[in-house]
Design a protein with these regions (language model features):
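Short, compositionally biased strand/turn segments
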Residues: 84-88, 150
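Extreme N-terminal starter segment of soluble prokaryotic enzymes
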Residues: 1-3
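Iron-sulfur cluster-binding cysteine motifs and their immediate structural context
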Residues: 32-39, 58-77, 87-102
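N-terminal pre-triad scaffold of radical SAM enzymes
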Residues: 5-58, 75-84
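Short, conserved beta-strand segments within well-ordered enzyme catalytic domains
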Residues: 21-23, 69, 128, 157
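N-terminal-biased segments
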Residues: 15-16, 23-24, 41, 45-46, ...
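Conserved AdoMet/S-adenosylmethionine-binding subsite of the radical SAM
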Residues: 107-210
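Fold-independent oxyanion-binding glycine-rich loops
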Residues: 7, 25, 37, 79-80, ...
């Protein structure tokens, strides 16, 4: 199942009105200017706030796989040994370690998104699917979310780099109100522009490219 790193409520910069933004984990690009670098990899991973770490070493002591060691008073993680058991997260005295990326069944996710329906209706807002790259996720999963929101008459925006096969857009177009496509460069630019042109041509007024 695809992974989600965060469900951000009361977003006002990810589309019209007040929105709930869902950040998916995984992106085919590795832009150095990425706003959400923790969402680039498709797998779960451990992250921690180095500035708040006291160097107590508890994480290294409780790790059953020897994945965390202390070097110069700071914890170092060997990702090859880490099994994502969560013990370092649970025992961290400062509460600054976490496993990034959680699974959400469609019904569970939609139920959470519908909690803010009142704000969507009063502000002309809705839900934004972002990332990472939401269009790189399983088409069936994203499509199920989009259909469920459409059934509830919730406006849906998809924030995408466009760097995926056009067939993925084709499947979800009937259920999306707006595509927000940021400009990209390098090898991704040609695919971005081709997909953007096709999306606008097919959807007309209901889709915007920004």
């Amino acid at each position: 199942m695809d992974l989600i790193t965060n469900i951000q409520k009361y977003s006002i910069h990810d589309g019209d009105g007040i929105r709930t933004t869902v950040f998916f984990k995984g992106c085919p690009l590795k832009c150095v200017w990425c706003h959400n670098p923790e969402t680039q990899r498709f797998e779960q991973e451990i992250q921690y706030d180095a500035e708040k770490c006291t160097g107590c070493g508890v994480c290294a002591k409780v790790c059953p796989n020897g994945a965390v060691t202390m070097e110069d008073g700071r914890p170092k993680l060997d990702k090859k040994l880490c099994k994502l058991c969560g013990k370092c997260e649970n025992f961290c005295t400062q509460g600054i370690r976490e496993i990034v990326g959680q699974e959400y069944p469609v019904k569970t996710l939609v139920k959470e998104l519908m909690k803010d329906l009142m704000f969507y209706e009063q502000s002309g807002g809705g839900v934004t699917l972002s990332g990472g790259e939401v269009m790189a996720m399983s088409t069936d999963y994203v499509l199920a979310i989009a259909k469920a929101l459409k059934k509830e008459e919730v406006s849906l925006t998809i924030d995408t780099c466009g760097y995926v096969p056009y067939e993925k857009f084709e499947a979800i177009l009937p259920y999306v109100d707006t595509f927000s496509m940021g400009n990209v460069g390098g090898t991704a630019a040609e695919i971005f522009y081709k997909n953007g042109q096709k999306v606008v041509a097919v959807s007309g007024h209901c889709t915007s490219i920004s």
